[in-house]
Amino acid sequence: MNSVGEACTDMKREYDQCFNRWFAEKFLKGDSSGDPCTDLFKRYQQCVQKAIKEKEIPIEGLEFMGHGKEKPENSS
């Protein structure tokens, strides 16, 4: 699947490959000692955010695209 920004598509594929490799070769085998794809994700995230702004796509709460951020607690 392509990214929201054409310029971001290669970054998305690179991140997807990195994540899938890490998930299959490390995480599923019990090694959760780190995510080697963090820098790729951050670059891809910035590219997508820029594309969304350039295309003037109205998205409330763009901060949901954070990596490793805690989810806000629900007030039930």
Swiss-Prot record:
A GO BP entry: regulation of membrane lipid distribution
Major localization listed first in the record, in broad terms: mitochondrion
Superkingdom of origin: Eukaryota
InterPro entries the record matches: MDM35_apoptosis
PANTHER family referenced in this protein's UniProt entry, alphabetically: TP53-REGULATED INHIBITOR OF APOPTOSIS 1
Gene, per the UniProt record: TRIAP1
Modification N-acetylmethionine occurs at: M1
Disulfide linkage: C8-C47, C18-C37
UniProt keywords, alphabetically: Acetylation, Apoptosis, Coiled coil, Disulfide bond, Lipid transport, Mitochondrion, Transport
Site (Important for interaction with PRELID3A): F27, F41
Induction, per UniProt: In p53/TP53-dependent manner in response to low levels of DNA damage. Not induced when DNA damage is severe.
Subunit structure: Monomer. Interacts with APAF1 and HSP70. Forms a complex with PRELID1 in the mitochondrion intermembrane space. Interacts with PRELID3A.
PROSITE patterns: CHCH
Localization in the cell: Mitochondrion; Mitochondrion intermembrane space
Catalytic activities: a 1,2-diacyl-sn-glycero-3-phosphate(in) = a 1,2-diacyl-sn-glycero-3-phosphate(out)
Segments carrying motif Cx9C motif 2: 37-47
GO cellular component, one term: nucleoplasm
GO molecular function: p53 binding
Source species of the chain: Homo sapiens
Function per UniProt: Involved in the modulation of the mitochondrial apoptotic pathway by ensuring the accumulation of cardiolipin (CL) in mitochondrial membranes. In vitro, the TRIAP1:PRELID1 complex mediates the transfer of phosphatidic acid (PA) between liposomes and probably functions as a PA transporter across the mitochondrion intermembrane space to provide PA for CL synthesis in the inner membrane.
Span of domain CHCH: 5-55
Family: Belongs to the TRIAP1/MDM35 family.
Coiled-coil parts of chain: 1-52
Protein name: TP53-regulated inhibitor of apoptosis 1
Intervals of motif Cx9C motif 1: 8-18
